[in-house]
Structures are given as C-alpha cells and as structure tokens.
C-alpha cells in the first residue's frame, strides 16, 4: 500500500512537471516561433499559395532578411528537396529518420524549374514506402514555390507550404516561409492536435528555421564549419538523455527530491536550447552542467522518520 501511494505520487509529480513545461511552451514560445522573424504586416498580408488553402486551422509565417540578391536566394530555394540539394537543415537528424539527405553547399548546374504536380521529395523515394514528399502546386520562378503537404501518398492534402522571395534592393532579399494547415471548420481531433502542438510544431520550427538560416548562409557565402550543427544537436541529445535518466531515477528512487529537480532542469533545457538556439558555447555549458549533475541526483539519503518527497511510509 505504501509503495503504491509512493509511486502514484512520484508519477503525479513528473506529470505535473511535464504539464508545467508544456504550459510555458504554449503560452510563450509557440506564439513567438509561429511568426519567427516576421513583421506584423508580413503575418497579416496574403502571400502566394494562400488561395490554395482557405480557412486554415493554423498559419505560421516566418521570415529572414538575406544580404544577397533575390536571384541568388531563389537559386537556393529552387533546389530544395532530397532529390536536389537537400534542405540545408540538420542533416544528421534528418538522416536518423532515414531521409538520405545530403545538403548541397554549391548551386547544382542545369536544374529545371519545378512544375505543378511534381513531387518534391522530403526523404528518399526508397524510404517510408515512397510517401515522404510534397506536391508542387505553384511555381512562380524567381518569386514563389508553393507545395501541398500530405500525410501519406494516397491521402488528401492537409495544408500548404510556401517559399516566397522578395527583393529589398539590388543586394538584399526577404525570404518568407508560410505554412497553412488543417481546416478551421473541421471537427477537432484532440489526440492528433495534442501531438501536433507539442511534438510536430516545435520540431518543424527547429528544422525550418535552420533551413532558412542555411539558405541565408549559402546565399551570403558564409557557411559555418560542418561540425557546428552536429555539436548543437549533441547538446540537445545530452539534455534528452539526462531527462530520461532523471525521470527513471525519480520513478524508482523514493528517497530524495534531487531527481525531480534534475528532471525539471533537463526538461527546461530541452525546451529552450532547440527553440531559442543560444550560442553554441552556452548550449554546451548547459549540457555539461546537466550531465555533471547526474551523479549528484543519485545521491542523498532518505529523510529520517520515513517521509520524503515521493515516498509515504504508512504507520505499522
């Protein structure tokens, strides 16, 4: 009986911490990343492709200014795709999902413009049953590339994904990326919506922002060393590993609050490091502190008298 109450309390505490982190994300981080880099005017105005998906349930508009001619930016946009130049994002993460992507660091010669109805591959056609693609719906060369997104090869479209390049003079351009998804009038699917909010949306933002930065780096000819992306992702993986270790420790150790404290710290790091993307030195220091705290979290003694956080000893 005492053990059952103890374990139930520990599970409730962990779920409470997860709910608190999710609440912080939904209240503060999600509204920010849904319009990362975009002005009020850019968020409000129509962009190419909006007409293909009216009345969406969700709209995200992100933007970045690139110090390169619009023609140069477009050249990198039009070779997006696993079948062309990749997505200029976290190649290592993409290939963990069997995408078989190799990001190009140079413009590929003699690429034709995309045509409506063409598949733009997100992963190799040989992976994921050949379903990892979006369909080109509109292509205005030099200006806009709009795709229809699908869940599976035979499924109806679920939204649009648009890339718009606007000149800001001879040597600068604005890249806008807009996603429109779902139907506002559709009946809610709460389980899928929760997954979309807490898993797909933040993951999509992290990858899409890196793609936009990757386009800017290539157009401006200032590519960072390849190890930086790997090191950045490694700090997130370290935070995830510490989160799992602390969670298991909190579930199975009844004596001390330290695993709960480390679980909260690792959860906050896993929430903030990929989303806010601080300088690599800051991310590395945070990850190192979390890893160093793992032995500390396993320490501590049971409080005298039989009562400690996460453990209730019933009287004999």
Please report, for each region that a protein language model flagged, where it lies by residue.
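N-terminal Lys/Arg-rich, disordered targeting/topogenic segments
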Residues: 1-7
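Short acidic N-proximal helix/loop "leader" segments that mark the beginning
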Residues: 16-59
């Amino acid at each position: 009986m005492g053990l059952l109450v103890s374990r139930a309390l520990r599970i409730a505490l962990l779920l409470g911490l997860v709910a608190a982190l999710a609440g912080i994300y939904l209240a503060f981080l999600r509204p920010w990343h849904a319009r990362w880099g975009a002005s009020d005017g850019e968020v409000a105005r129509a962009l190419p492709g909006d007409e293909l998906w009216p009345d969406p349930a969700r709209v995200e508009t992100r933007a970045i200014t690139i110090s390169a001619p619009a023609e140069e930016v477009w050249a990198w946009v039009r070779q997006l795709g696993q079948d062309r130049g990749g997505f200029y994002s976290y190649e290592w993460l993409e290939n963990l999902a069997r995408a078989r992507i190799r990001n190009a660091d140079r413009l590929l010669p003699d690429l034709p413009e995309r045509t409506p109805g063409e598949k733009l591959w997100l992963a190799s056609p040989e992976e994921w049953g050949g379903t990892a693609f979006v369909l080109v719906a509109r292509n205005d060369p030099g200006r806009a590339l709009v795709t229809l997104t699908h869940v599976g090869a035979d499924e109806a479209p679920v939204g649009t994904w648009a890339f718009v390049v606007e000149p800001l003079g001879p040597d600068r351009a604005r890249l806008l990326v807009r996603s429109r998804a779902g139907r506002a009038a559709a009946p809610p699917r709460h389980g899928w919506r929760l997954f979309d909010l807490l898993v797909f949306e933040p993951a999509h933002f992290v990858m899409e922002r890196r793609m936009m930065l990757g386009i800017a780096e290539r157009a401006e000819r200032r590519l960072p060393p390849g190890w930086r992306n790997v090191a950045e992702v490694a700090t997130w993986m370290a935070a995830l590993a510490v989160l799992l270790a602390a969670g298991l420790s909190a579930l199975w150790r009844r004596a001390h609050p330290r695993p709960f404290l480390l679980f909260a710290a690792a959860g906050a790091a896993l929430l903030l490091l990929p989303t806010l993307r601080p300088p690599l030195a800051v991310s590395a220091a945070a990850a190192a502190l979390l890893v160093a705290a793992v032995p500390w979290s396993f320490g501590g003694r049971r409080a005298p008298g039989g009562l400690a956080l996460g453990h209730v000893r019933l009287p004999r």
